[in-house]
């Protein structure tokens, strides 16, 4: 809902960038207050941090912001609710977690339930951009699912440090794109300005 309000006056890259950057700043400050250190010397972590940062922050935040220009917030929410349905099959292939008959049945029931919640007419009407918006929201859920699998395979790291560094990676990826495509954002008014801050 807040994203939809922010999109009234800001572009999707700006909204996504605000989410990652403000979150990164807040967590960096929290790390400092708690006296925790970042494992910057562990080179084995950085490929994971880079991939998780892109797939859990930069890409899904942008896809959700872009998609919500054309679809209701409810669709984006339902897409996120379907996240476990993507994680289970991926975990079977990449995380050595067998997809048993019971889990398979759960996935099928989950997909059916999501389809019922979304409704039969969700893909009807709205033009081509609505369909692309729906695909963007589903793509964001899939991106989160892949990031979840990578997080399971990631070497041990402080959870707060992991969250902080992945948001930093997302910010580093999004800021140049935002500046190049949408420019430096300004204060667009109290309603959308506060929405983008939250």
Can you name each region flagged by the protein language model?
Residues 15, 159-163:
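Juxtamembrane helix-start motifs in multi-pass secondary transporters
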Residues 52-61, 83-84, 118, 140-145, ...:
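Transmembrane alpha-helical core positions of polytopic small-molecule transporters
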Residues 1, 28, 32, 62, ...:
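Residue-level hotspots within transmembrane alpha-helices of multi-pass secondary transporters
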Residues 14-25, 55-56, 61-98, 103-104, ...:
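Specific alpha-helical transmembrane segments that line the substrate/conduction pathway
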Residues 17-22, 47, 51, 55, ...:
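Hydrophobic residues within alpha-helical transmembrane segments
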Residues 1-18, 66, 123-153, 172-174, ...:
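Glycine-/small-residue-enriched transmembrane alpha-helix faces in small-molecule transporters
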Residues 27, 90, 99-121, 140-144, ...:
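Hydrophobic transmembrane alpha-helices of multi-pass small-molecule transport proteins
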Residues 24-52, 65, 69-70, 93-105, ...:
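Membrane-interface interhelical linkers
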